[in-house]
Amino acid sequence: LTSNQPISILSRFEDRETVFAAHKLTVCAWGYYTDIADVIRQISNKPVDDLHELWRRIVFTILVSNSDDHLKNHGFIYAGGDRWRLSPAFDINPSPSRHRVLETGIIQGGSFDASLDIALEACEFFELTPVDARQQAFQMAETIVSNWKQALRDEGASSDDLRTYADAFEHTESQKALWLNL
């Protein structure tokens, strides 16, 4: 590599024989996390756990300004007996210049805004109570806002890099989540 452009090198977890991307499980044109949730209800061997995890991923995507939340970045791992589990998260790319819009909408028929309010309104569809959802969003925001700078420093980020990426982690939606504890 000869460029000064930032890159990420990750070790991928998947075994191609046991992982299928969410977009391959149906011929329907998805566009919403609630569509993925419907599939989880049909195929998961632990649907409530997977629904909770999917909702947390929505909030995480919002809080880190993930620019790569399209359907091809959601998958399932074969769990045996014709059952599946939501795969570990992958292809998460914080983007400081990210428009506050998601690639995958939260609720069918809703906007594609990267909105904590919409995620909280949808929590019951993902089998979370509003109280639990608010608490989880707060804890996630607190962890992200408190730790992102050190995490980047630990990976060799410069002060300029930190300034560049600040808007990906510290923005209106992360502040809303932090206010949930008040």
For the regions a language model picked out, list residue spans one by one.
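Anionic ligand-binding catalytic core segments
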Residues: 1-71, 75-182
